[in-house]
Swiss-Prot record:
One of its GO terms (biological process) is biotin biosynthetic process. The gene is bioH. One of its GO terms (cellular component) is cytoplasm. GO terms for molecular function: pimelyl-[acyl-carrier protein] methyl ester esterase activity. Belongs to the AB hydrolase superfamily. Carboxylesterase BioH family. HAMAP family: Carboxylester. It is found in: Cytoplasm. It comes from the Bacteria. This is Pimeloyl-[acyl-carrier protein] methyl ester esterase. Transmembrane segments: none annotated. Substrate binds at residues 22, 82-83, 143-147, 235. NCBIfam families: bioH (TIGR01738).
Length: 255
């Protein structure tokens, strides 16, 4: 039976689970592990089908959340980046008693642009799916480049993301397509409006995938959560601005 890659480290007493985004793996957190480890017991996970968690096919958001939750500590703070933010949010909705606090990073409850809602145009996501079957590696690289666009360290950050992908086993086209399906179809705006778990949303001011307007719209709609927009950061603020990012995480965890 397929099992998740799950690594635990750190000197703190508080469990913090880190969930990566589409196409990547837990290696993406390496630049902030040393900053977080004194404060938390860190759990870094490769999502099903990604990195070292091989043997899983494409799956729904709720199935992915259930598989991750099955290996998780009894109670934890959950931090999810991008697609991982949807997984962490789904876990908070389906098992709130196991979630002390929720942090989403450069994530949206609805990644697809809709009337009155900023996001990625659905045909762009469909285009990525089409290109995946034609040129798998180039498509993943293009997506990674989009994530760092606009930051002062864009090239360096994109190189780091690419090395994270290439150092571990690559997800299959089926798994990547399944992840894009989730990004295209998921809409947790209404369910998360009633979430009773303490909830912090972190954004990059220059993010081209999750526009900063999302932060303001959700501030109005979700009175139960707070948002912080990190200036000059794009879709991977923990890579471009690790100090500002970890300060926010530690302050929220200790509040």
């Amino acid at each position: 039976m397929a099992t998740l890659y799950w690594q635990t480290e750190g000197a703190g007493n508080t469990d913090l689970v880190l969930l990566h985004g589409w196409g990547l793996n837990a290696q993406v957190w390496q630049s902030i592990i040393a900053r977080l480890a004194p404060h938390f017991r860190l759990h870094v996970v490769d999502l099903p089908g990604y990195g070292r968690s091989q043997g899983f096919g494409a799956m729904s958001l709720s199935d992915m959340a259930n598989i991750v939750l099955a290996q998780a500590p009894e109670r934890a703070i959950w931090l999810g980046w991008s697609l991982g933010g949807l997984v962490a949010s789904q876990i908070a909705l389906s098992a709130p008693e196991r979630v002390d606090k929720l942090i989403t990073v450069a994530s949206s409850p609805c990644f697809s642009a809709q009337d009155g809602w900023p996001g990625i145009k659905p045909d762009v996501l469909q285009g990525f799916q089409q290109q995946l079957s034609e040129d798998f590696q180039r498509t993943v690289e293009r997506f990674l480049a989009l994530q760092t666009l606009g930051t002062e360290s864009a090239r360096q950050d994109a190189r780091l993301l690419k090395s994270v992908v290439l150092e571990q086993p690559m997800p299959s086209v089926e798994v990547l397509n399944g992840g894009l399906d989730i990004l295209r179809e998921a809409d947790l705006r209404q369910p998360l409006a009633d979430l009773a778990v303490p909830f912090l949303r972190l954004y990059g001011a220059l993010d081209g995938l999750v526009p900063r307007k999302v932060a303001g719209l959700l501030d109005e709609q979700w009175l139960n959560s707070t948002s912080v927009v990190i200036p000059k950061a794009a879709h991977a603020p923990f890579i471009s601005h690790p100090d500002a990012f970890t300060e926010q995480v530690i302050a929220f965890a200790q509040a």
